[in-house]
């Protein structure tokens, strides 16, 4: 089950990256929908050992199986990890590139636009190719592989 499903008032965010899917995120998402929840598929927080990881109102739960959903919704889950932003793995990080990880839908152009994703392209088109190349060269920006 990829994509968002509107069901109920409780909004559950679950990653839809390849690792989460391999760990059973679709089945967990379907269990939340069956329980009357709205599921939003988002990018991963990067805490892969907790996948499938669900987030409800900033609180994390994982790794989950479909049978864990009722305990999560009842507030009795032993798989509660507390506030995701306060988790030691996340709290010690300064996330620049991944600042919106776990909050946006990775394939959503609407989410991309909402967070200013087209601003760089608009600026590059405004100043033209030569000025864009000059700015990149001057900045020293390099590819992830060092190119």
Give residue spans per PLM region:
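Feature of Fe-S/electron-transfer and energy-metabolism proteins
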Residues: 1-147
């Amino acid at each position: 089950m990829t994509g968002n499903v509107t069901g109920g008032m409780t909004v559950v965010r679950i990653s839809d990256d390849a690792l989460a899917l391999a760990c059973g995120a679709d089945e967990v998402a379907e269990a939340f929908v069956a329980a009357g929840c709205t599921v939003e598929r988002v990018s991963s927080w990067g805490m892969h050992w907790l996948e499938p990881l669900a987030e409800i109102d900033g609180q994390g739960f994982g790794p989950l199986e479909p049978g864990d959903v009722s305990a999560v919704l009842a507030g009795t889950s032993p798989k509660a990890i507390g506030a995701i932003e306060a988790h030691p793995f996340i709290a010690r990080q300064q996330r620049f590139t991944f600042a919106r990880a776990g909050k946006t839908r990775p394939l959503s152009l609407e989410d991309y636009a909402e967070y200013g994703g087209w601003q760089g392209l608009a600026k590059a088109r405004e100043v033209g190719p030569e000025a864009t190349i000059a700015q990149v060269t001057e900045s020293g920006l390099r590819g992830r592989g060092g190119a």
